[in-house]
Structures are given as structure tokens and as C-alpha cells.
Amino acid sequence: MAAERALGNEPVDVSAQKIGYDIASHDPRSGHLRFIEVKGRIDGADSVMVTRQEIITSLHEPEKFMLAIVQIENGFAREPIYLQGALQTNEPTFDVTAIQFNLKSLLARAEAQREVTQ
């Protein structure tokens, strides 16, 4: 929430609603809305679990969906690393409740996106 406010956005915590993301963040300059799913990862973590609903939201709203990976180092949260868009190319089957993603792969995808936009 603080990182979104620092960007000049107006975030709202919607995590209790279980709608496929944790934060709805409005950019008052552009009028755009961002759907942000936050995943905190401790030192040494090698994966991130993403629920079926979060994946479906990323597929249905790829231009709005962002995965924010917040790494926890020595008990302190680092700045979020954002990965925008669909997390995979297809919807999980109904018997899949969550998928484990490799953390290094997600961070590499986020870095590649950042390089393209700079």
C-alpha cells in the first residue's frame, strides 16, 4: 500500500473479498486501475504459490493485473518487484487450486519487462 501511495496512486485493500488480487490501485493521473496481487517471500524462498483465482484474474485482465513480489530480507520488506500481465497462457483445470511458480523465473520475467519499459 505504501509503495502504491509513493507512486501517487490511490490503493484500496480488497484482499478480504477473495477476488483474485489484494489491492485495487487507481492512478489519478491516467485514470487506470491496477489489480495487484502481493506475494511476500522470505530469504531463501524458491517458489511462489498463486491460486487458481489469481491466475484466472491475470488471464482475464492482463493489462490491469500485476503480481507484486515483496522479498523479506533480515525481517525487512524490500520494495515490490512488479510483474504485469497473465501469469500463464491457459486457465488451470477445475481440480487445480493453486500453482507453484519458480521465484527466480518470475523475477527474471519482471526484470525483462522493466528493461523493455525503460
Where are these regions (language model features)?
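Mixed-charge (Asp/Glu-Lys/Arg
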Residues: 1-118
